Amino acid sequence: MKFYPLTFIPILKDRIWGGTKLKTYLNKDIVSQTTGESWEISTVPNDISVVRSGSLIGKNINEVIAMYPEEILGKVVIERFGKQFPLLFKFIDAKEDLSIQLHPNDALAKERHNSFGKTEMWYVMQADEAARLVVGFKNDSNSAAYLDHLQRKKVVDLLEMHPVKKAMFSF
C-alpha cells in the first residue's frame, strides 16, 4: 500500500474548564462554549480515532495498526509496547483551571487500568497573560500537608506552578 499522511476525525470533549479557542485558533467544528479538548489521535476505549480521508477512510486506528503494524508503529515501538499506539495526542483549551490529576506509572496503570502510564508533554500554542502550568507538588509537600491543605481547601498552595507563554515547551 502507498501510505499518505493519515488524518483522523477529531474527538471533541466538553469540559467545565473548556472554552472556544479550539474553534478560534484551530478551526475546530465546535458548538459548545466549553469545549476543552480535541483528541487528534486516540486509542482510548470508546474514543478510538477514525481515519478522515483516503483509502483507509472510516477505519479506526486500531484496525489500521492491525493491517500495517510495522509501517505505522515501527519495530522499536512494537518491541516496547506491542501492537498498541502508546500515545494520546490532543489540543486543550483551558479557559479555567484544570482539575488536579494523578497519573500512574506504567506498572500501576497496567495493574489497575490495563493501560500505559501517563507522562505528559506540553507545547503552548497560545497563552493568556496570567497562564501557568502546574508541574506537580512543591518539593517540601507531604501527606500530612496535603490532608491539612485539603481540609482547608488550600491544596493549590502546595502546587508547583510556572508561568507559560506562547511557543513554550514542557516535559
Outline where the language-model segments fall.
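Transition-metal
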Residues: 1-141
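Short, structured beta-strand/loop micro-motifs enriched in basic residues and often containing a Trp
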Residues: 148-156
